UniProtKB/Swiss-Prot annotation:
Entry's Gene Ontology BP terms: DNA recombination; regulation of DNA-templated transcription; regulation of translation
Keywords: DNA recombination, DNA-binding, Transcription, Transcription regulation, Translation regulation
Protein name per UniProt: Integration host factor subunit beta
Pfam short name (any one): Bac_DNA_binding
Coiled coil: none
Database matches in InterPro entries: Hist_DNA-bd (IPR000119), Histone-like_DNA-bd_CS (IPR020816), IHF-like_DNA-bd_dom_sf (IPR010992), IHF_beta (IPR005685)
Amino acid sequence: MTKSELIERLVMKYPQLRAQDVEDTVKLMIERICHTLEKGDRVEIRGFGSFSLHYRESRQGRNPKTGESVRVPAKSIPYFRAGKELRERVDEEINQ
């Protein structure tokens, strides 16, 4: 599901809400999560999951085109860990 599809589905499910308000809210939520991660903080949405940063050390890599060794710099990457409730719901739905 894309962000646009999420907005469409929310508008269909809640017709009393204006489409622009739904779009603004979804964009604002995503922006706040990104901003919090940029500060190095963790975001937890109970029952859904948590967003955090995982640090990756600098390492030796290889350019797939040329085969040349290159140094990959250290970096922090966003990481999502599904919460228990979400994992159980998905598992239950798939195993029916």
